[in-house]
Amino acid sequence: MQPQSKDPCQELHPLVSTLAASIRSSWQKLPELAPLCTADDLKAIHGELDGETLFIGNELYQCRGFRKIHLEIARLGNGLQILHCVWFPDPQYDLPIFGADIVAGPAGISAAIVDLSPTSGELPDPVFKGLEAIERPAFRQVRDLPGWGTIFSSKVCFIRPDGADEEALFNQVVIDYLEVLSDCASRANPESPTTVSTINRYEGQLNYCLQQKRNDKTRRVLEKAFDPEWADRYIELLLFDNPPTP
């Protein structure tokens, strides 16, 4: 694996760049934000897939209320681009999991999803009310969730944006969702690690990670570009690592 001569994050699809900037701006407002220690070989990754250069860049943080905040941007040659972001809460806090993903190619954005996913059956009441107050755009191409999509809330937004106008609207939806989450996080207090509610949220987050790992497309791409052992390490330790036992 060799570094590229130019910045692989240049010339990204406009929505990938815009959404990444929106997410970074949102996490700057979080309390006690600090970098999360990560193995050097998992921060900036270069490989090759089908003769094209694959780059994966990762940014990781933690803060009060969230055990891990992860933004991943991947690019394959001049074609496929992926933005993946997850904010995993500390199970002692009654907060949902934020998740957003974009898949872009030469023909544009094929998939865009954002959700605040519950870890204890249903969304916390302040989060649900906050999302209810958001005026959702009438996107023209709503996509069906995968079979393992039961982990998502009723407020999940999964679309194929139809043009630059809908791409801008989707970016605003993500900003709105993050504002709701950030506001709730600023007012949340930790519960004891031994309470039933904390344990339930821990188990709910375990299930979320388990279901996300069922996405075989991710594993196949990583195995082909690197090797099965490396792919397993990347998925288990970085993408969807289990929360620490309370």
Curated annotation (Swiss-Prot):
GO terms for biological process: phytochromobilin biosynthetic process. Its EC number is 1.3.7.5. The keyword Oxidoreductase applies. One of its GO terms (molecular function) is cobalt ion binding. It holds the Pfam family Fe_bilin_red. It is an enzyme of class 1 (oxidoreductase). It catalyses: (2R,3Z)-phycocyanobilin + 4 oxidized [2Fe-2S]-[ferredoxin] = biliverdin IXalpha + 4 reduced [2Fe-2S]-[ferredoxin] + 4 H(+). Keywords: Oxidoreductase. Catalyzes the four-electron reduction of biliverdin IX-alpha (2-electron reduction at both the A and D rings); the reaction proceeds via an isolatable 2-electron intermediate, 181,182-dihydrobiliverdin. Belongs to the HY2 family. This is Phycocyanobilin:ferredoxin oxidoreductase. It comes from Synechococcus sp. (strain CC9902).
